Amino acid sequence: MDVAAAFLERLDRACQTWGEVNPQEFAQLVRDLERVASPLQFEVLAQAFADDHYLKQEYVGRLLARLNPPCSRPLNELLPQLLPGWNLSIEQLPRYLAGVFGRAALLDALDTVDRTGAQGHTKTKTVRYWRRSIDIQQDR
């Protein structure tokens, strides 16, 4: 089993074992993900957004915030793949996307998604909400 598959298996096991984010398990997930080649880390983490599983996405959101892995895919390609399964409570995904691509690029990509009507307005509206929240916190 490769390191990416082992990481995903451990993530699934953590979600089945614990009813909330377990600090020791999170620390192990950080170590496991650091063994995955840096360019692949985001691709591995993005798989958690395939379905709306809160705990799995919470772990992944914290990993995105902690490790800030690079992302080589264009934002306009990512959003239609990530938004359908994204749990609206996971604020780390919009934070990550704004940090990696910039706030203006994120807003432009959200406008594109809205024009296509593919994801529904609720998801893009919530990303905008989290983005504004980020701006307010940074202004303090």
Q: Locations of the language-model features?
A:
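Alpha-helical interaction segments
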Residues: 7-8, 16, 76, 91, ...
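Amphipathic alpha-helical scaffolding segments comprising HEAT/armadillo-like alpha-solenoid repeats
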Residues: 1-13, 35-48, 69-81, 103-114, ...
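Structural motif
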Residues: 51-54, 84
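Short acidic, glycine/proline-enriched loop segments that cap or flank alpha-helices
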Residues: 82-85, 94
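Short, surface-exposed, polar/charged, turn-prone segments marking secondary-structure boundaries
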Residues: 109-111, 121-124
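Structural detector for internal amphipathic alpha-helices that build alpha-solenoid repeat scaffolds
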Residues: 16, 21-36, 51, 58-69, ...
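HEAT/HEAT-like alpha-solenoid repeats
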Residues: 85, 113-119
